[in-house]
C-alpha cells in the first residue's frame, strides 16, 4: 500500500540570474487579526468549547505546516520568526551586560580575579532573603554567578562598567532592529520561495560573511583591543590607567610599544615576511601560566586562520558567474558501490523540506555543542576561567544538556519530514530508500548492541559490588587488582602529548594539558589544569556512556525509520506525526507514533547526559581540581577517590551522590540556602511528573466529572467544558516536568557543592 504525502510546491531554479526576489506588501499588518486567539486556524479561531482548546492553541501556533500548505508562505513565517528569536537573544544579552554594569563587582574582580568571586546579582532585603548575598571577597556581598561572563568580558578587553552599559544599550538597539526586520520581511518585502532555495548563494554569504568576516572582525578586535588591554592587566596595571580601546585602534605607536612588529605596518604582509607578526600571532599551545587560559595570542592567530579558510570557502559555490560548485551536482555524483542512486533527489528534499534541513542542522549543532562542552575545560579559552570551578562545572553541564536536546530535536524533525514531506513514489533506490528497505536489519543489530553493552557494562559493576560486599577486593576490576586499562585512550593521550616538536614543530606545548607529558598549571595556588590520568574506573563508566548513547540512538532512529509504516501499522503515515493509538478495536497499537519515540528518547537522553555530568563532576574533583602548596604538593577536593570508589554502584551512591549532597542538604541558614530550596522544589517538580506519566486519561476524566457536578450544584460551572488532558498532552506535560525537575535538582546539587568546596 503506497501512502502519498501532499505534493510540496517545488520550484528548482534553472536560470541562476533571478532579478526580483521579493514580493512587496504581501500581507497587511492587522492588529485586529493578531488580537484574535487562534487566527491562524479556522477551527481554533471559533473559540473554546472545551479546555482542550487552549492546548491546541499552543500546540499549533508555531506549527506553520498546519496553517497552510504553501511552501513559500511557510518559509516566510519561519524566516520572520528567526528575527524574533534573534531579538530575544539580543534582549537577553543586553540584560546580562546590564547586570554586569549595574549590580556586579566586575571592576573589583578585574583587579583581583584569584581572591574575588564573580557576582552580578544582589538580593533585596525582603523577608530576610538578604542571607543569600554571600561574601564573594573584596567586601562585596551578592550571589556568585557561574556563567563565565566576567572571564569573557576580560578576554574581550572590557575594563569598566561604563563599557558594559554601552554594550547593553547597543544590544537593545539591535533587539529593536531585529523585531523591525521580522515585521519588514514578512509584511513589507517578503522573499520569494526561489530566494530561500538558492543554496549556493546562501552558502557563499553564510560562509564568507557570517563565519569568514565574523572571524576576521573578531581576530581584528583581539589584536587591536583585547591583546594590548590584557597585556596591561596581566602586568598589574590599574584598569582605570589603561588606554581606551579606540586609542589602541587609532594610535599605532601605542601598540608598537607592546608588539614591536606593529611599527612596520603592513610591509611584512605584502613582502610575505609573515613571521614578523609572530609576536602577536603565536602558535604556543598549552595555557598561559598567569591566567590559566589559552594564550590570547594563540586565539587571535586561530581566528585569523579560520577567517581565511571560511573566506575561501565562501567563494566556492556557483551563482551568477558559471564557475564553482553546484550542490545538486555534488550530491548526485555522490555514489558508492553499495548505495544505488546515492544522493540523487536529496537536493530536492533539502530545498523543499525545511524539516529535513533542520534535522541535519540540529544533529550537527548538537554534536558541536557537546564538543564545546569537552573543550571548555580541556582548553579553557578565557583568563581565570580554569580556576573558577563552579563556572567550569556549569559550562560543561549546560553545553551537555543543550547538545542532548538538540540531538533529540534532530530525530524529531527527521520523523516529521518522513511523515509530512517524504514522497515514496518519487524516491527509488537512493540512499534513504535503501536505508528504509533494510531498516529491520539496522534496528535489530542496534538492539543487539544495546543488549550487549547494557549487560556487559553493568555486569562489570555488579561483579565489583558483589566482590566488594563479600570482602574480596583482590577479585575486583580495579587499578590495584584485575586491571582493565583504557589502552586506546591512553595511547591517544600519549600521541597528543608528544605532538609538539614533531607534528607541530613551532608549538611549545600540546593542545591541552589533559593529554599528559606537561606540568600542571596553577593560578593563585589553585590547580587550573593538569594531565588527567585514565584508568579502570574510566574504562567502566565509558562503557556506561556507550550503552546509554546507543539506547538513545536506538529509540530515536527507530522512530524515524518506522515513522511512515511498520508491520504493526502499515498505514502509519496517514495517522500523522503524533497520535495516541491506531483507533478503537486495535489493541496494542498505542505509543507507536513518531512523537512517542521522541518522548521516550528524551528520557534516555536524560540518562545519558546525567551519567556524563556526574562522571565529569566527580572525576574533576578527584583528579584535577584542588590546591597546591609551596612545596608543590597538590591536594584534590575529594583526594583522588574516583579510581577506587566509582568502580561499584554502591560507591557512586555513597561517595558521590550522598557524600557530595551534604552541602545542598545542609545549606539552610547559609548563603547557599536557595540551592537547598531549589533542591527540594525541583525534586517535587520531578515527582509531580510521575502523576502524569503513570495514570491514564480515564481516571482524570472521571475525577473531573465529579468536580464539574459539584460546581453545577453551586451554580458556578464554567461555560468552557473541562476535559482531561489527551494521552499525548499528558505525556508531554509529564516529560517536561520530569526533565525540568531532574535538571534543576542536578543544578542545585552541583552548585551548592562546588561553591562550598571550590
Swiss-Prot record:
Phylloquinone binds at residue 700. The keyword Zinc-finger does not apply. It holds the Pfam family PsaA_PsaB. It is an enzyme of class 1 (oxidoreductase). GO terms for cellular component: chloroplast thylakoid membrane; photosystem I. The keyword Chloroplast applies. InterPro entries: PSI_PsaA, PSI_PsaA/B, PSI_PsaA/B_CS, PSI_PsaA/B_sf. Its EC number is 1.97.1.12. [4Fe-4S] cluster binds at residues 581, 590. GO terms for molecular function: 4 iron, 4 sulfur cluster binding; chlorophyll binding; electron transfer activity; magnesium ion binding; oxidoreductase activity. Keywords: 4Fe-4S, Chlorophyll, Chloroplast, Chromophore, Electron transport, Iron, Iron-sulfur, Magnesium, Membrane, Metal-binding, Oxidoreductase, Photosynthesis, Photosystem I, Plastid, Thylakoid, Transmembrane, Transmembrane helix, Transport. Chlorophyll a' binds at residue 683. The chain crosses the membrane at residues 78-101, 164-187, 203-227, 299-317, 354-377, 393-419, 441-463, 539-557, 597-618, 672-694, 732-753. It is a multi-pass membrane protein. Belongs to the PsaA/PsaB family. HAMAP family: PSI_PsaA. This is Photosystem I P700 chlorophyll a apoprotein A1. It comes from Pisum sativum (Garden pea). The lineage of its organism: Eukaryota, Viridiplantae, Streptophyta, Embryophyta, Tracheophyta.
